[in-house]
Amino acid sequence: MWDDDEPDYDPDYDPEEERRRLEATPIFQKAEEIRDLTQRIVETMDKNDPESEIQSSLMLEDSMIIPAKIAGAEAVDDYILKMENAVVIKIHARSLLTRTASLKYLELVAPAYLQLLRDEIEAFRLLFRKWVASFQLDTTKEGDGWGLFVDDE
């Protein structure tokens, strides 16, 4: 009766194997390194300073979203969904990069720490470009109606 009466999952799917595969990808590893480095940088900030609290919260959010969206993109075969995740990743990576300039200007973090993070983000950007280039467009599938990644007409 319903389209979802039959299970649509793969009985051979192994979530542990999928997790190991994801964790072995260079882009996910670099995203995790950025998240860890961001956490360490945030720990050096003055917890009693309201500006530091705001900046650290935003930095942590950006750094946590990046690996989560990589996992989301890796979990699907759909080109449009992969590209949507890629855009979100780019936005948060750039936000994190921009925040390093703010922190330097506000003198909230040692410039050497910020340069380390900037270097890691640049290494991530290079991996990101290769990763996105590996996405396979399925020309037999219709677009999503928005025309952003696939011409719908």
Per-range role (PLM):
Residues M1-E153:
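Amphipathic alpha-helical assembly/interaction segments
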